[in-house]
Amino acid sequence: MASRRLRHAPHTATDEFHQALRRLFAPLCVHEDHFHVQLVIGRGALQPEEAAVETSQPPAQFAAQTSAVLQQQLVHHVPRSCVLHLFVTDKRFLNRELGDRLYQRFLREWLVCRQAEREAVTALFQRMVMTKPYFVFLAYVYSMDCLHTVAVRTMAFLRFERYDTDYLLRRLRLYPPERLHALLDGVTASLLGDLHRFLFGVDLRLPVLHPTSSPCLALLRAKRFDARADLAVYHRNQWCHQRQPRSPQLRGLIAALRRYAGKVPCGNPLYVLARQAVQTFCDTCPRYLVPLRALGLHDETRGGGSTAAAAAVGHAGAGQQARHVEPTKIVLFALSAALRGGLIGSVIDLPLWCLCRLKCERHLDARSLVAVVCRQCGHCLNLGKEKLHCQQNFPLNSMFYYRDRQEKSVIFNTHAELVHCSLCGSQRVVRQRVYELVSETLFGQRCVRVGWKAVLGLNAACAVYDHRLAFDVILPCAARTCDSTVVVRDVTVPRLLRLTSHGHGLLCARCQTGEYRDSCLESEDGAPLCRGCALVKQTACHVGGHIVQQARGGLAAASSSSSPHGLPHV
C-alpha cells in the first residue's frame, strides 16, 4: 500500500478535497437554529437520545394510519445528532454507538457520490478504502472547519481563525508520518489529542466554554498565569518586553535586578508589585476594563517576544502561520481578579420580603452576627467545626479550588501584628454582617437598608445560579430578639427565599426552648424604640396582629439543626 504520509498537493486538489468534504458531511450535520454556536458555548453539547414514536392511540388504530402520516410523525422525532457530537470532550468522547450510526449514514452518501469527489477525498491522504478510523479523521477535519466558520461569522473572540482546512492541511505536512499512519489506522482519544495539540498548541475541548461553574470560561482552569517570571509592558497599543529607548538609569536598574533576582527565592519582585497594584485597583474601582485586545483565552504563549517578532517568524516558513504572541500572565491575573468578585464567595445576600423580620437592636452589638471572610479564597473563616455541604463546587484544577478541607480560621501574627487566612495565607480578611440595618440618605431622602445574608460552607457562592441545587447554609435566627444563628440543611434557592418572608423563619436552639426576651415593643421601661422596632410597628403585619411567632410548628417546613456556635462573636 502506498505511504500514508500526506503529500504536497496543489491548491486545486485542496479545494476539491474541501468541497467534497463539505458535501459528504452536510447530511450528517445540523446547521439550523445556530446549532453549532450553541454546541460551542455548551447549550447543544447534550446529545438527545433516539426518540421513539409516541402514540396515544390504540395499536389497531395506529397500525391503520397511512404511511404519509407515520412518516410525518417520525420526522418530528428525528434526533438532532450532529457529527460534532463525536468530539464533545466528556465521557462520551468518540462515542462508539454514535460513531457507528454516523459511519453508516456516511457510507450511504459515499456510495452514491460522484467519482471525482471520491478521488478528492481518498487521493489526498492516499487511502484506498473508507474505513471507520479514516471516517472519524475526516469528521475531525470537518468539525474544525465548522468551528472556524462559527468564529468568523458569530464568535470571533474564540480565536478559531486558525482552524480552517487550509491551515490544518499545511500543518499536517509537518506531522510525523508514523504517528499519522497510526492515527488513520485506529483513532483513539490519546492519538487525536496529540494531533490537536500539535496542530493548534492547545488541548481539544468542546464545548469551548466548558461547563464547570456558571458562568464558566477556560480561565477558571488556567493556573499557568502565575508560572512565568517575565513582566510585559503595554506600550503604544502593543505588547512588548523591551521598551525602546531605555535610559541609562533604567538599564542599570534592570541589570541590578537581574544580578540579584536569581539569588533571592522570591520570584519576580516587579510582577509582585504589578499584581498587587492590579488587585488593589480591581477591589477599589466599581468599573474597569481589562485590555484584552485580540488575546484569546485559549492562546498559549511559548516564550517571549512582541507581535511583530511573532509575525516575522510566521512568514519565515510555509508551514508556519503568523500569530499574535501576547503575554497572558498579568492579563489572566486581572481577569481572575475580575471574576473573583462575581464568582467566589461564601456570603449570599437575601431579599427581605417583609419588615416584620427586622431585629430589635437592643439585643445586638457590634460583634453580633459577623462573618469573617477571606476575599482571596472566598471562604468563611469563623464557621468553627460546622460541616456545611454543597452540591456545587469548582473543579479540582480551578484556580478557585482549595484542597484544604480542614477547619478554617484566622491566624494572628503577634510579631508583625497581622492577620492571615489559614487556608490561602492572604491578609485580605474582612468582616461582613450577616444581619445589618444601615441608615442612608439617597437623593435627599432618608432610607434604611436591610442586609439579611446566608453563609455557605464553600466558596462557590455561584451555586445560587442553579435553583435546583441543594446546599447547607447558616442563617440568622428568625426571632427578633435573638443574635444567634441556625443551620438549614438541603435548602434550595426557592426555599431560601421563602425563609426570609414573615412566618417562615427558623429558630435556634435557645429560642426553641422557650427563652423569652422583650423587644422595644413589649418593654415597659419607657425607652425609645430602636430603628428596627419603629419600622416593625408601622408594618401591616404588626397592625393586623401578626408578629413572628416563636412556635415549633413552623420548624417542620425545613430540615434544620440549630447551631448557636455557627458564627461566634468576633
UniProtKB/Swiss-Prot annotation:
<dbReference type="GO" id="GO:0016032">
    <property type="term" value="P:viral process"/>
</dbReference>
<protein>
    <recommendedName>
        <fullName>Uncharacterized protein UL49</fullName>
    </recommendedName>
</protein>
<comment type="similarity">
    <text>Belongs to the herpesviridae UL49 family.</text>
</comment>
<dbReference type="InterPro" id="IPR004339">
    <property type="entry name" value="UL49"/>
</dbReference>
<dbReference type="Pfam" id="PF03117">
    <property type="entry name" value="Herpes_UL49_1"/>
</dbReference>
<dbReference type="GO" id="GO:0019033">
    <property type="term" value="C:viral tegument"/>
</dbReference>
